[in-house]
């Protein structure tokens, strides 16, 4: 179950994300309800803070980037998964 108070994000960043990817962050946090979601540390983008990538199913496979701040999950970006990411999700899900 998603508790909204566990999550946070910058509203301007969300507005940019909606314009660019058509996806709001209230929808993005639903990836964490997918019992088959895949998560990994993103070393390449973690110079200033630890970032994580998540693939999860919310009507379609979504790719979400987040960090942890003050015991909350802070959403950085969200979009539909690429074809390669979808293959990774379905391969891991069915393995």
Place the predicted regions along the sequence by residue.
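Ribonuclease/tRNase effector modules and their secretory precursors
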Residues: 1-95
């Amino acid at each position: 179950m998603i508790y909204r108070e566990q999550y946070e994000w910058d509203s301007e960043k969300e507005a940019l994300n909606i314009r660019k990817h058509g996806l709001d962050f209230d929808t993005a946090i639903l990836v964490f309800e997918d019992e088959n979601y895949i998560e990994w540390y993103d070393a390449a983008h973690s110079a200033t803070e630890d970032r994580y990538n998540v693939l999860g199913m919310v009507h379609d496979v979504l790719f979400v980037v987040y960090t942890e701040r003050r015991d909350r999950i802070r959403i950085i970006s969200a979009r539909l998964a690429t074809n390669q990411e979808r293959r990774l999700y379905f391969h891991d899900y069915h393995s």
